[in-house]
UniProtKB/Swiss-Prot annotation:
Changing P132L: 2-fold increase of stimulation of DnaB helicase activity. It holds the Pfam family SSB. One of its GO terms (molecular function) is single-stranded DNA binding. The gene is ssb. It comes from Mycobacterium tuberculosis (strain ATCC 25618 / H37Rv). NCBIfam families: PRK07772.1, ssb. One of its GO terms (biological process) is DNA damage response. Gene3D superfamilies: Nucleic acid-binding proteins. SUPFAM superfamilies: Nucleic acid-binding proteins (SSF50249). This is Single-stranded DNA-binding protein. Binds single-stranded (ss)DNA. At low concentrations (0.02 to 0.16 uM), stimulates the 5'-3' helicase activity of DnaB. At higher concentrtions eventually totally inhibits DnaB helicase. One of its GO terms (cellular component) is extracellular region. Residues 120-164 are annotated as: Disordered. Residues 1-110 form the SSB domain.
Length: 164
């Protein structure tokens, strides 16, 4: 990865991510990010849209399942990954080359939105192809030390002195 070209893109998803599975069971999500630069025109005093850049992206394994479950068309995202060149031949026999982003990290942009993040539970390792249901509960569990306030005192004891 030392010679890879890394890129960070901020843009919007042009469609819902497309989730597929390889014959071996590895998940892959494909999606396109549209990034449009904004240019300030000093003569008119207005912001104008520049030419949009559309980049095809792919992400693998558990992260692919998380992307497909979490992100939808129009979502503003921040993508970090590596540019990859791929050549293929069309059904008509024409050779084509595309540049894609192999995504390392992705998340929603919080500049104009809010998000609630739930940690995904791991149950089956890489390539399991199963999507565990998120464990959400509205009441505090007895096993969760952060789920409720301390029983007494500000430091868990009965006095007002810190324990150190």
């Amino acid at each position: 990865m030392a010679g890879d070209t890394t890129i960070t893109i901020v843009g919007n998803l042009t469609a819902d991510p497309e989730l597929r599975f390889t014959p071996s069971g590895a998940a892959v999500a494909n999606f396109t990010v549209a990034s449009t630069p904004r240019i300030y025109d000093r003569q008119t005093g207005e912001w104008k849209d520049g030419e949009a850049l559309f980049l095809r992206c792919n992400i693998w394994r558990e992260a692919a399942e998380n992307v497909a479950e979490s992100l939808t068309r129009g979502a503003r995202v921040i993508v970090s990954g590596r540019l990859k060149q791929r050549s293929f031949e069309t059904r008509e026999g024409e050779k084509r080359t595309v540049i894609e982003v192999e995504v390392d990290e992705i998340g929603p942009s919080l500049r104009y939105a809010t998000a609630k993040v739930n940690k995904a539970s791991r149950s089956g390792g890489f390539g399991s192809g199963s999507r565990p249901a998120p464990a959400q509960t509205s009441s505090a569990s007895g096993d969760d030390p952060w789920g409720s306030a301390p029983a007494s005192g500000s430091f868990g004891g009965g006095d007002d002195e810190p324990p150190f």
